[in-house]
Amino acid sequence: MKEIVIASNNQGKINDFKVIFPDYHVIGISELILDFDVEETGSTFEENAILKSEAAAKALNKTVIADDSGLEVFALNGEPGIYSARYAGENKSDEANIEKLLNKLGNTTDRRAQFVCVISMSGPDMETKVFKGTVSGEIADGKYGENGFGYDPIFYVPKLDRTMAQLSKEQKGQISHRRNAINLLEAYLAGDQNV
């Protein structure tokens, strides 16, 4: 079985990759390097993904995939953006992040939002490649559903009439921002150099 190393300690992301790549042995970097942590000093999802994949590829001397992803709310000028995981502060819970977002959004009628995922692939003998996927939706007025992680309970997908947290892992795996970025990665790996 082929192996994919994910430069992330976020078990939710690793689980997403496992669902999307069922024919691969998906390994989180913490299984290979204890305490692997890269400071996300970039100002964009792309910069942060590249920082992680290049650092991990150098440390392991093998090809590694990293992603940086988050939620952008149009009425909040793209917040929480690259700060999605720590929107309410360092070491805060998903619940605290959601609460801050809903409070900040208040009764705003423009609830349009998008999840963004940028995947970068780096290796010892290759130029880093970057793939971006998005999924559009709206911020719900409260939390709905029990599945997923992060902002999934408040991210409503109109075409499915569900939040991401109301979808099964398999359903989410077919439409997510990560899935859309991975589609581009897979096309590249299959030889489509125009991706």
UniProtKB/Swiss-Prot annotation:
E.C. numbers: 3.6.1.66
Keywords (A to Z) from UniProt: Hydrolase, Magnesium, Metal-binding, Nucleotide metabolism, Nucleotide-binding
GO CC annotation: cytosol
Binding residue positions for substrate: S8, N9, N10, Q11, G12, K13, S69, F149, G150, Y151, D152, K172, H177, R178
Active site: residue positions: D68
Family to which the UniProt record says this protein belongs: Belongs to the HAM1 NTPase family.
Name assigned to this protein: dITP/XTP pyrophosphatase
Lineage: Bacteria, Bacillati, Bacillota, Bacilli, Bacillales
